[in-house]
Amino acid sequence: MADVEVRKEKKKKKIKEEPLDGDDIGTLQKQGNFQIKPSSKIAELDTSQWPLLLKNFDKLNIRSNHYTPLAHGSSPLNRDIKEYMKTGFINLDKPSNPSSHEVVAWIKKILKVEKTGHSGTLDPKVTGCLIVCIDRATRLVKSQQSAGKEYVAIFKLHGAVESVAKVRQGLEKLRGALFQRPPLISAVKRQLRVRTVYDSKLLDYDETRNMGVFWVSCEAGSYIRTMCVHLGLVLGVGGQMLELRRVRSGIQSERDGMVTMHDVLDAMWLYENHKDESMLRRVIKPLEGLLVNHKRIIMKDSSVNAVCYGAKITLPGVLRYEDGIEIDQEIVICTTKGEAICLAIALMTTATMASCDHGVVAKIKRVIMERDTYPRKWGLGPKASAKKALIAAGKLDKFGRPNENTPKEWLTGYVDYNAKKPAAQEVSPTNGSSEPSKRKLSTSSVEETAAAAVSEETPSKDKKKKKKKHKGDEEAPEAAEEEAEPVEKEKKKKKKKDKDRDRDEAQE
């Protein structure tokens, strides 16, 4: 009996509560309202478990904590399901045989969306990580296509090699910048190009069959098939690639919630027939998941829509900024709710931002957020409000320009910076006198202005005649050459006349 009890105790396993994985965003969305709240002092929060772009936000440098939170927009995980689909991506396990474009077209048809794009073409026989961007997320496709890739390849050598060490040594030689030419069967022009291989490892090698498996981390656009051929040449026996799988594209790997085509189909079927969003939210991830490795700048809610319309990203609109921002570095501008507004190129370093109180922080590279997601908050100052009142009263035209009803106070007190300044500006007086100094015209300049006035009054025919005279003067040296040409032209005309006569006679 005692033995039986011991066995039962061994069989009973304690069910451990597994901590929620940060990548499982389907379950994270219901845990809380992820949003930065305005405060007068630094709040003590544990933001290490916050998702996406708000992770560790309390470690960002604070420029200001004072702003007016707006109810518009929402956390990427709490978006409405239709909006969630339009601003998401799928980390897809591409099946063998169909091309990347076919797979993307199928997903577009399954999800019933307007646009889809992918992170870089995979050959039909190649499987693995293919990031499919949906609708608004297609704006990130270019940055994903240029991101680094990782592959696992199976190769076969055409002859025996002395040892596995030789194969490993050959792989190590194929690192750094390499010359590559696309394979015989390829969709692009077969011209020589340089691609960088960052790292490679020989995972396994079978000496009996001369087959091996290696892992490689390389630049986008590298040809692994060509690399296998080069490995065979380095070893002196020749070689070829048998199979290939992409295990990482950018920051998304095959371990980061990769899904199959069947998962996408099942998720959409559940949503359409049972209104169950849970699986669809697990299959599709918010586009902010692709920008986690970018340096962040958090903007005030009132300046979000202005940036969406292309306004400059200036310091007064910045709430927080990350350490280590360098000039010309690609960064992400985000809201207090963790939504990506745009990708930008930094024009200030972190140190400059800390020491300045004005200036342009970054220039926009690609706007991601839809316009008017947040309300317009520009044109609400005292001058702008007064201008709107005058337009409504008819004292300014609909474009805000002065008309006959415009009051004198407005004309003297308002400076329109959008109006184009005249080319000849008045020179500021250098003397102590209040009157602006006027430059006296010389007698020659007076005569020139008078002559110009007379020439303006004369009809345009005289101008044409003058132009013809000038042309005649220019063409004078070429006259000798032109005299020889008429003789040849006359001969040609005679020949044409003779041909015309022959045709007429033939018709008669």
Curated annotation (Swiss-Prot):
Assembly with partners or alone: Component of the box H/ACA small nucleolar ribonucleoprotein (H/ACA snoRNP) complex consisting of Nop60B, Gar1, NPH2 and Nop10, and associated with H/ACA-type snoRNAs.
Top-level taxon in the UniProt lineage: Eukaryota
Effect of gene knockout: Embryonic to larval lethal. RNAi-mediated knockdown in female germline cells results in a cyst differentiation defect that prevents progression from the 8-cell cyst stage and oocyte differentiation.
Region listing for Disordered, in residue ranges: 1-29, 423-508
UniProt modified residues of type Phosphoserine: S442, S444, S445, S455
PROSITE patterns named among the record's database cross-references: PUA
Residues covered by the PUA domain: 294-369
Catalytic activity, EC: 5.4.99.-
Phosphothreonine modifications at: T443, T449, T458
GO biological process: box H/ACA sno(s)RNA 3'-end processing; germ cell development; mRNA pseudouridine synthesis; pseudouridine synthesis; ribosome biogenesis; rRNA processing; rRNA pseudouridine synthesis; snRNA pseudouridine synthesis
Function comment: Catalytic subunit of the box H/ACA small nucleolar ribonucleoprotein (H/ACA snoRNP) complex, which catalyzes pseudouridylation of rRNA. This involves the isomerization of uridine such that the ribose is subsequently attached to C5, instead of the normal N1. Pseudouridine ('psi') residues may serve to stabilize the conformation of rRNAs. Required for ribosome biogenesis; plays a central role in ribosomal RNA processing. H/ACA snoRNP complex-dependent ribosome biogenesis is important in female germline cell differentiation during oogenesis. Essential for viability and female fertility.
A Pfam family that the UniProt record links to this protein: TruB_C_2
Gene Ontology terms, MF aspect: pseudouridine synthase activity; RNA binding
Record-annotated active site: D123
Family from the record: Belongs to the pseudouridine synthase TruB family.
Protein name: H/ACA ribonucleoprotein complex subunit 4
GO CC annotations on file: box H/ACA snoRNP complex; nucleolus
Composition bias, Acidic residues: 475-485
InterPro entries in UniProt: Dyskerin-like, PsdUridine_synth_cat_dom_sf, PsdUridine_synth_N, PUA, PUA-like_sf, PUA_sf, tRNA_PsdUridine_synth_B_fam, TruB_C
Note: The name minifly was chosen to reflect the strong reduction in body size of heterozygous mutant flies.
Subcellular location: Nucleus, Nucleolus
Keywords for this protein: Isomerase, Nucleus, Phosphoprotein, Ribonucleoprotein, Ribosome biogenesis, RNA-binding, rRNA processing
Origin species: Drosophila melanogaster
Compositional bias of kind Low complexity: 442-457
CDD domains according to UniProt: PseudoU_synth_hDyskerin, PUA_Cbf5
Catalytic activity: a uridine in RNA = a pseudouridine in RNA
